[in-house]
């Protein structure tokens, strides 16, 4: 009997908290200072936030001068120079933006954080991050499957095609959604991650995200994710359709409604779910990996 390995197996002793890991301030190319950015996210009910200025590390000590507004603030930055952009989340110090991105990934890991690749389908050629690099690098947590700012730039804000190609190759990677906010108006509240956090501290948020105990969203709320034998159930507040996909991004089931309960198809190597709401509201579960 195949085994379903997934990140939602122990949802006890914590609570779901929404947050964003990709945002900019006037320290790099953002239009607002740190406190204005923090205030905006807090006013929208976010539970955690990372300031990720380009190659400018924001430490936990740096945050002490600001009012966190009851949010958990996460150290990090966007590694930008010398190659495709990456998020550095939760490490204890600045990491040099080496052109060899594997070295960046390794240095972040050594310093207690995790890394992910940003907006892979940015630019007119949809290739900000060459796929060969995504395939060759090891030890990163995942990639942005949605990046809000790319909606108004060239390329696609979505990266699920890259995700599915990597998952189909057997990689175990998480999908993240972020604002990548820069502008003073219109860049916040586009994409976020909803993590099940047990320890409400920076370390606790980093642990939840690095272990994949979250879903990515642009507006759909997931209420329940459960595995029972060979069946997976997803229940939402506001999805109009839920689609189940397997390797190669092949759809094997869908339901027009807010919930779905499907049996894992024979021979599947992974399964994931996309929850479609109205307009541009989506939610994406993390993959369920099938081991024979």
Over which residues does each language-model region extend?
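A metal-dependent hydrolase metal-coordination microenvironment
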Residues: 2-120, 124-139, 145-165, 169, ...
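C-terminal functional module detector
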Residues: 1-16, 170-174, 179-292
